[in-house]
């Protein structure tokens, strides 16, 4: 098991515990409480997948955070916060690409958590790129405005957008929705790649093919799921 995966889970467990204490003192607003509930479900799922006890992971996460805070000077902390807390808005798409109307010959739609995934399953054997406009904080995707799938000819063949009835979404929500979209498009033998900007801030990584770091098994599973559920 990757040590980074374990330590990330441990820190996330401790930070969730801190946020829970904030909520218990009636200091959290509605979006804060909504994220707290959704993150709790996510942590339970991750804990089950990793085979880790959440209570133990929380204690270890506390030690990791305390060590970092002890080693970091106040001045370094101030500089980090000043640069990281400034939310940035990044654009893969032009205004025209975002606002352009499009239609589907074989429309398919799926609600993936707080996001809506739409695609045209009539599209086959195309090279497709996913572009998105979104905000970033702490060098991680914070809020997705709109994601669209484009063919080499510029036609729009898929889209992911937030549901107005579900305020707020996480980075994991976006990645899961992208997985559904990619699985559906690849089912029809399309080749899908993700823009470099989206790779960098959604996955904090990239690869030569332009695809997110899904394994072959994951892609096959997503394609099968998409066929039956979308």
UniProtKB/Swiss-Prot annotation:
Database matches in Pfam families: Flu_NS1
An MF annotation (GO) of this entry: protein serine/threonine kinase inhibitor activity
Ranges of biased composition (kind: Polar residues): 205-217
Gene Ontology CC terms, in alphabetical order: host cell cytoplasm; host cell nucleus
UniProt entry tagged with the keyword RNA-binding: yes
Motif (Nuclear export signal): 137-146
Subunit structure: Homodimer. Interacts with host TRIM25 (via coiled coil); this interaction specifically inhibits TRIM25 multimerization and TRIM25-mediated RIGI CARD ubiquitination. Interacts with human EIF2AK2/PKR, CPSF4, IVNS1ABP and PABPN1.
Protein's recorded name: Non-structural protein 1
Gene name per UniProt: NS
């Amino acid at each position: 098991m990757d040590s980074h995966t374990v330590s990330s889970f441990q820190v996330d467990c401790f930070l969730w515990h801190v946020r829970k204490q904030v909520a218990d003192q009636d200091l959290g607003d509605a979006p804060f409480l909504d994220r707290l509930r959704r993150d709790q479900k996510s942590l339970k799922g991750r804990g089950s997948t990793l085979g880790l006890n959440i209570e133990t992971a929380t204690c270890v996460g506390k030690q990791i955070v305390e060590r970092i805070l002890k080693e970091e000077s106040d001045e370094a902390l101030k500089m980090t916060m000043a640069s990281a807390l400034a939310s940035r808005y990044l654009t893969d798409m032009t205004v025209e690409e975002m606002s352009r109307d499009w239609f589907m010959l074989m429309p398919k739609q799926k609600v993936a958590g707080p996001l809506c995934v739409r695609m045209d399953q009539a599209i086959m054997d195309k090279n497709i790129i996913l572009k998105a406009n979104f905000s970033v904080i702490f060098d991680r995707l914070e809020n997705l405005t709109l994601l669209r799938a484009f063919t080499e000819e510029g036609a729009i063949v898929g889209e992911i957008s937030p549901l107005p009835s579900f305020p707020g979404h996480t980075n994991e929500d976006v990645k899961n929705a992208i997985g559904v979209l990619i699985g559906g498009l690849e089912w029809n033998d399309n080749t899908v790649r993700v823009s470099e900007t989206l790779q960098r801030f959604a996955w904090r990584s990239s690869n030569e093919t332009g695809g997110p770091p899904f394994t072959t098994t994951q892609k096959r599973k997503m394609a099968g799921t998409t066929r039956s559920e979308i």
